[in-house]
Curated annotation (Swiss-Prot):
Key words of the record: 4Fe-4S, Cytoplasm, Iron, Iron-sulfur, Metal-binding, S-adenosyl-L-methionine, Transferase
Database matches in InterPro entries: Elp3/MiaA/NifB-like_rSAM (IPR006638), Methylthiotransferase (IPR005839), Methylthiotransferase_CS (IPR020612), Methylthiotransferase_N (IPR013848), Methylthiotransferase_N_sf (IPR038135), NA-bd_OB-fold (IPR012340), Ribosomal_uS12_MeSTrfase_RimO (IPR005840), rSAM (IPR007197)
CDD domains: Radical_SAM
SMART domains given in the database record: Elp3 (SM00729)
GO biological process: tRNA modification
Catalytic reaction equation(s): L-aspartate(89)-[ribosomal protein uS12]-hydrogen + (sulfur carrier)-SH + AH2 + 2 S-adenosyl-L-methionine = 3-methylsulfanyl-L-aspartate(89)-[ribosomal protein uS12]-hydrogen + (sulfur carrier)-H + 5'-deoxyadenosine + L-methionine + A + S-adenosyl-L-homocysteine + 2 H(+)
Binding site for [4Fe-4S] cluster 1: 19, 55, 84
Species this protein is from: Pseudomonas fluorescens (strain Pf0-1)
Protein's name according to its UniProt entry: Ribosomal protein uS12 methylthiotransferase RimO
Gene name linked to the record: rimO
Annotated EC: 2.8.4.4
Cofactors, names only: [4Fe-4S] cluster
Molecular function GO labels: 4 iron, 4 sulfur cluster binding; aspartic acid methylthiotransferase activity; metal ion binding; protein methylthiotransferase activity
Family: Belongs to the methylthiotransferase family. RimO subfamily.
Primary role: Catalyzes the methylthiolation of an aspartic acid residue of ribosomal protein uS12.
Length: 445
């Protein structure tokens, strides 16, 4: 007796662009689709429809998003667009009129509904067959995960359009955040990377109201959240920390080993004049004093930051002020961007002199050379010391991992020459044998 084979599950291709916050959005959409019986495939040719999660933070990111949308249309033909650039539906359709649907950031239900319209889910789908793990679908390696604690931002930095794309701050309930963190740890995650548009503002919008986790009260506030996360027994790393005064409360937690002594805090510039034009905190002298105090409390503290050079009105004097400030601050990990005007940003309306492109490039190169010397000198101090390393990759040559001062994708690596016996997700103590401006070399102890 012949039997009719069951129809195949509908298949979705997915391209995720932009920052870790967008990656978390992609994970949420994929989790919902997987729960409904969709298979996620890795090639355009195998997909019944392709979803592109776009980035719209700067013009180069928009250009990349439009290029990827075009590639997906060429290779597949059925394309749904979502994410930050989705707020510019007109611009997207002007370039790619054949896209099937366009939705903005955080519009998870609309994306899933758009997929339903193009490729309906199987009517006889049995959720017990296509089980989704409790932690959901993750696009990161199994041993680390991003934990998004809020959406949106209440600031009005003149170079940024995030509030217009993602709205005002909306903090997730603290119990929900901690439940997710606990599920991730139970699934094998060894490192939680706490992210949002403005991590240190967590709870401001709900006046730090008290929530509950595991039957105990917990305030919706950054310090209390970190205290609770520290009980899970994994690395907890903080990203996108705006320099509020209450950030000082986090440093003792780092000194006590409750969370990693790693602070990702974007200063953007040091010149008071430029910071004022950016609508950023302009207390560079107090910032230096705070950094000094933080390091006195927690000597192992690693500070990562990002800066913008070539902002409208930036003079050579302003730029030199920034270089001198970097010398004083002795930051560990630093990224730098040349200012790029973004459509809709308030900075476009400032009556300030535009910095020529060749001057921007020159300042960027000087900035990077200046900071590389600082970063290299600070890493040289690690030679001979023992560090704990979380392994990311292993091959016959050895292992590649990160220690507490390395976030994935953006910071350096630790190369373990005798680490071919290890596996991703292992934690191992090593002795540092060499260093350059970004990376360390070490041997297992």
């Amino acid at each position: 007796m012949s039997t009719t084979p069951a129809p195949a599950n509908p298949k979705v291709g997915f391209v995720s662009l932009g920052c870790p916050k967008a990656l978390v959005d992609s994970e949420r959409i994929l989790t919902q689709l997987r729960m409904e019986g969709y298979d996620v495939v890795s090639t355009y040719q195998d997909a019944d429809v392709v979803v592109v999660n776009t980035c719209g933070f700067i013009d180069s990111a928009k250009a990349e998003s439009l290029e990827v949308i075009g590639e997906a249309i060429k290779e597949n033909g059925k394309v749904i667009v979502t994410g930050c650039m989705g707020v510019e539906e007109g611009n997207i359709r002007d370039v790619h009129p054949s896209v099937l649907a366009v939705t903005g950031p955080q519009q998870y239900e609309q994306v899933v509904n758009a997929v339903h319209e193009v490729v309906p889910p199987k009517q006889d789908h049995n959720p017990l067959i296509d089980l989704v793990p409790p932690q959901g679908i993750k696009l990161t390696p199994r041993h680390y995960a991003y934990l998004k604690i809020s959406e949106g931002c209440n600031h009005s930095c003149s170079f940024c359009i995030i509030p217009s794309m993602r709205g005002k701050l909306v903090s997730r309930p603290v119990g929900d955040v901690l439940d997710e963190a606990q599920r991730l740890v139970k699934s094998g995650v060894k490192e939680l990377l706490v992210i949002s548009q403005d991590t240190s503002a967590y709870g401001v919008d709900v006046k730090y109201r008290t929530g509950f986790w595991n039957g105990a009260p917990v305030k919706t506030r950054m310090t209390e959240l970190c205290e609770a996360l520290s009980t899970l027994g994994v690395w907890v790393r903080l990203h996108y920390v705006y320099p509020y005064p209450h950030v000082d409360e986090l440093i003792p937690l780092m000194a006590a080993g409750k969370i990693l002594p790693y602070l990702d805090i974007p200063f953007q510039h040091a010149s008071p004049k430029v910071l004022k034009s950016m609508k950023r905190p302009a207390f560079e002298d107090k910032t230096l004093a705070r950094i000094k105090n933080w390091r006195e409390i927690c000597p192992d503290l690693i500070i990562r930051s990002t800066f913008i050079v070539g902002f409208p009105g930036e003079t050579e004097e302003d730029f030199q002020y920034l270089l001198d400030w970097l010398t004083e601050a002795q930051l560990d990990r630093v990224g730098c961007f040349q200012y790029s005007p973004v459509e809709g940003a308030p900075a476009n309306d400032l009556d300030l002199e535009v910095v020529p492109d060749d001057v921007k490039q020159d300042r960027w190169e000087r900035f990077m050379a200046h900071q590389q010397a600082i970063s290299s000198a600070r890493l040289q101090l690690r030679i001979g010391r023992e560090i704990e390393v979380l392994v990311d990759e292993v091959d016959e040559q050895g292992a590649v991992g990160r220690c507490f001062f390395d976030a994935p994708e953006i910071d350096g690596n630790v190369f373990i020459d005798n680490g071919s016996n290890l596996k991703p997700g292992d934690k191992v103590w090593c002795k540092v044998t060499d260093a350059d401006e970004y990376d360390l070399w070490a041997e297992q102890i």
